[in-house]
């Protein structure tokens, strides 16, 4: 039987991906890049959930990740539609420019 990768490696990978996503959310000014960073954080949480489910031998974690991925696909569709609508109205996706109220 091949040696299995320890759960701590998966959790470390998940932590690194989550940190990269968090840095992206905090430093980027373009709405699309912020959106992609949030998706990276969501996928990092999915990796952690699957790692815990694998270590406990439970399939419910994988089922939960499948549901989360389905909801994330809907989030992507809605989020990109909102970003496109904002771009059509304002000609920019820079969040600093979008924070200003129209007068």
From Swiss-Prot:
What GO terms fall under cellular component here? NADH dehydrogenase complex; plasma membrane
Spell out the family assignment given in the record's similarity comment.
Answer: Belongs to the complex I subunit 4L family.
Q: Which Pfam families does this UniProt record tie to the protein?
A: Oxidored_q2
The primary site where this protein sits is: membrane
Q: Which reaction does it catalyse?
A: a quinone + NADH + 5 H(+)(in) = a quinol + NAD(+) + 4 H(+)(out)
Q: What does this protein do?
A: NDH-1 shuttles electrons from NADH, via FMN and iron-sulfur (Fe-S) centers, to quinones in the respiratory chain. The immediate electron acceptor for the enzyme in this species is believed to be a menaquinone. Couples the redox reaction to proton translocation (for every two electrons transferred, four hydrogen ions are translocated across the cytoplasmic membrane), and thus conserves the redox energy in a proton gradient.
Per UniProt, subunit arrangement is: NDH-1 is composed of 15 different subunits. Subunits NuoA, H, J, K, L, M, N constitute the membrane sector of the complex.
Cell compartments where the protein resides: Cell membrane
Query: Any stretches that span the bilayer, and where are they?
Result: 5-25, 32-52, 66-86
Organism listed in the record = Deinococcus radiodurans (strain ATCC 13939 / DSM 20539 / JCM 16871 / CCUG 27074 / LMG 4051 / NBRC 15346 / NCIMB 9279 / VKM B-1422 / R1)
* EC class (word): translocase
Is Transmembrane a UniProt keyword of this protein?
yes
- Extract one GO molecular function annotation from the record: NADH:ubiquinone reductase (non-electrogenic) activity
- The identity of this protein, by name, is NADH-quinone oxidoreductase subunit K
Protein keywords? Cell membrane, Membrane, NAD, Quinone, Translocase, Transmembrane, Transmembrane helix, Transport
Entry keyword annotation includes Glycoprotein? no
InterPro entries noted in UniProt: NADH_UbQ_OxRdtase_chain4L/K, NUOK/Mnh_C1-like
Name the domain of life this protein comes from. Answer: Bacteria
**What NCBIfam families does UniProt report for this protein, alphabetically?**
PRK05715.1-2 (NF004320), PRK05715.1-3 (NF004321), PRK05715.1-5 (NF004323)
- Which EC number applies? 7.1.1.-
């Amino acid at each position: 039987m091949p040696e299995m990768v320890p759960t701590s490696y998966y959790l470390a990978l998940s932590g690194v991906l989550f940190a990269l996503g968090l840095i992206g959310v905090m430093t980027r000014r373009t709405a699309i890049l912020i959106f992609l960073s949030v998706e990276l954080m969501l996928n990092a949480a999915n990796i952690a959930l699957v790692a815990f489910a694998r270590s406990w031998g439970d399939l419910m974690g994988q089922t939960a990740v499948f549901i989360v991925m389905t909801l994330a696909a809907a989030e992507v569709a809605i989020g990109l539609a909102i970003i496109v609508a904002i771009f059509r109205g304002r000609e920019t996706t820079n969040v600093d420019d979008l924070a200003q109220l129209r007068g």
